[in-house]
Amino acid sequence: MTENNRLSVKLPGLDLKNPIIPASGCFGFGEEYAKYYDLNKLGSIMVKATTLHPRFGNPTPRVAETASGMLNAIGLQNPGLEVIMTEKLPWLNENFPELPIIANVAGSEEADYVAVCAKIGDAANVKAIELNISCPNVKHGGQAFGTDPEVAAALVKACKAVSKVPLYVKLSPNVTDIVPIAKAVEAAGADGLTMINTLMGVRFDLKTRQPILANITGGLSGPAIKPVALKLIHQVAQVVDIPIIGMGGVANAQDVLEMYMAGASAVAVGTANFADPFVCPKIIDKLPELMDQYRIESLESLIQEVKEGKK
């Protein structure tokens, strides 16, 4: 078996030569990282969130360092669907035609999500949609879509009805019980899950006596959240039959294999890209050696082994 075959995985809409995917919000649309290496080396790319209209994001400061991670409250800043469809995604496809694109979709109400999902699958090389259901629902008092199984299922069903590509739903860890939400979105037609999104946190400035972030709270990411991600992925993998793209604190090849042990079928790398722009290709290069060390023939065989273990 060649190294390429050992690392390749097939998911709904995604035929990946390797499982490593830069996470949405940590890689922009690839322009900055393309200065460092050929993005065709990646398995896929989860591009920055797309909303129907441009969003300018939250006031600054938007980021704060924490032990083994960071807090961010960017606020889904993006140029909006039209610019992304006419400029950002065509640039990616033209320069990196071998790179499958996963479009991340966000919104403030169901109609916004549906409008974006109906169109973004038309862009060349967009093979799947990642639905960010952690956004506040302005029509339900600001409660995030992803905290209520019925609300989440209704959103997924509406988006699935118009989407031209498979739909992966990004689950929030900021809930009492993630299992009913995972089962609800699967029943509503989700083709896969991505998890986990960031945990909520806050830091204070001792001099000003105020929160460091202008938004007060932010999303906690980085190595600090990996055990939480592994626990929730393992929990959800026991009860769903759709594939999971695991994320949360991944920084090296060992972390990737841990995600597989928990039940993931591919892995997204987020905050680690800020510390080392080359982290994704480094992980890809290291994986075959580590798989040899632990007698793993291929990632597909590991997926099957983990599935057999949960029966």
Curated annotation (Swiss-Prot):
It is found in: Cytoplasm. Belongs to the dihydroorotate dehydrogenase family. Type 1 subfamily. The keyword Flavoprotein applies. It catalyses: (S)-dihydroorotate + NAD(+) = orotate + NADH + H(+). It is an enzyme of class 1 (oxidoreductase). Its main location: cytoplasm. It comes from Lactococcus lactis subsp. cremoris (strain MG1363). This is Dihydroorotate dehydrogenase B (NAD(+)), catalytic subunit. CDD domains: DHOD_1B_like. Pathway: Pyrimidine metabolism; UMP biosynthesis via de novo pathway; orotate from (S)-dihydroorotate (NAD(+) route): step 1/1. Its cofactor is FMN. Heterotetramer of 2 PyrK and 2 PyrD type B subunits. Keywords: Cytoplasm, Flavoprotein, FMN, NAD, Oxidoreductase, Pyrimidine biosynthesis. Substrate binds at residues 48, 72-76, 132, 197-198. The active site is at 135 (nucleophile).
